[in-house]
A protein has these predicted regions:
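Flexible beta->alpha loop and helix N-cap segments adjacent to enzyme active/binding sites
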Residues: 1-181
């Protein structure tokens, strides 16, 4: 799942990166990330080893608040993606059935399935709900990715929504960001 190189950077390297125009780099705890999301900021997550495969699963991800009506347009503007491409929701595994029609699925840790958003939840998470009222979901539990789970849990405690908008930390047509340079 997370098979890429584990990157570490010295304080000097991080300081050098932060000197570039337009770069804001913060090492912050979950509560700060949640506040940034609630304030409609796009947050990039770069932690641990990168994902192996076509989906960003919380280690090289761009996150946004799924409750924002025009969230798709905001993130598409940054990523230069086509308007019709759906975004994913990363959901705390134990809450997935409260938000999505999981049918016979117990989990979807690799973001392999698009499932129907429950009718009463569509208006709550418009940024991750596609035009056909489905969402490509990633269920997250502590064993799979404790740091990412804790972040989603912090968002849930603050908003009542156990889901974050998740897309890959890259631009259209480019590979996942693998280093900060």
């Amino acid at each position: 799942l997370y098979l890429g190189p584990k990157r570490t950077y010295t304080a000097e390297q991080i300081s050098e990166i932060c000197q570039r125009p337009g770069v804001v780099l913060e090492d912050c705890d979950d509560s700060k990330v949640v506040e940034l999301l609630i304030d409609k900021n796009i947050v990039s997550i770069f932690q641990g080893q990168s994902e192996n495969g076509p989906r960003a699963l919380g280690n090289r991800s761009i996150l946004f608040d799924p409750r924002v009506q025009d969230g798709k347009d905001i993130v598409n503007g940054v990523k230069h993606r086509e308007w019709f491409r759906p975004f994913a929701g990363s959901v705390m595994e134990e809450h997935a059935k409260e938000w999505f029609d999981m049918a016979s699925l117990d989990s979807s840790p690799y973001m392999m399935y698009a499932v129907k958003v429950l009718d009463e939840k569509v208006s709550v998470i418009p940024s991750v709900t596609h035009v056909d009222n489905t969402c490509r979901i990633q269920t997250v539990n502590k064993d799979q990715n404790e740091n990412y789970y804790n972040l989603i849990e912090a968002f849930y405690k603050k908003t009542g929504v156990p889901i974050v908008f998740n897309t890959s930390f890259n631009l259209a047509g480019e590979p996942l960001v693998e280093n900060l340079y």
